[in-house]
């Protein structure tokens, strides 16, 4: 399949089988479907929203064109530990068995409350950049949500990994 697409995100069904979660087949498919739906909605929102710094379809194409395996993660944080919570959510995904380690292309799209400190944004972007390849190209999007307080939502799309033979 990867030979016929620009980018591929895989949800290994084996990761839905754990001792802690006793899922029926229907429940496991619903979880995989929900992850896929959430990711598609996140990409659609990135493309269609008009934020302070926009990410458009051309930007998504730039990141994903000919990229091979890809990683997508969505993080949410509120309050004092919001940045660290988000970093933990977007750097890697246990379910997808992927991370941004070695990514040479990233989209980082942030929606934040209007009271967010610039130091929070700096901490977030530095941690994401540090986790990727040293020469990573980052397309950054940013908007505000006036209905939230002390909160951030972040979508990260990572692609074009240094070692394409490994799962990112």
Could you tell me what each predicted segment is?
Residues 2-168:
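Tubulin/FtsZ superfamily GTPase core signature
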């Amino acid at each position: 399949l990867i030979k016929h697409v620009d980018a591929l995100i895989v949800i290994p069904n084996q990761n839905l089988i754990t001792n802690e979660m006793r899922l029926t087949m229907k429940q496991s498919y619903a979880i995989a479907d929900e992850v896929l739906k959430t990711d598609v909605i996140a990409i659609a929102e990135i493309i269609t929203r008009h934020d302070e710094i926009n990410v458009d379809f051309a930007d998504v194409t730039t990141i994903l064109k000919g990229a091979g395996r890809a990683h997508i993660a969505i993080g949410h944080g509120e309050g004092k530990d919001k940045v660290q919570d988000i970093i933990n959510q977007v750097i890697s995904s246990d379910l997808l068995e992927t991370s941004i380690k070695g990514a040479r292309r990233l989209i980082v799209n942030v929606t934040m409350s209007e009271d967010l400190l610039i130091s929070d944004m700096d901490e977030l972007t530095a941690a994401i950049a540090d986790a990727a390849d040293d020469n990573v190209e980052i397309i950054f999007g940013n908007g505000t949500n006036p209905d939230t307080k002390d909160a951030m939502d972040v979508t990260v799309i990572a692609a074009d990994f240094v070692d394409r033979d490994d799962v990112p």
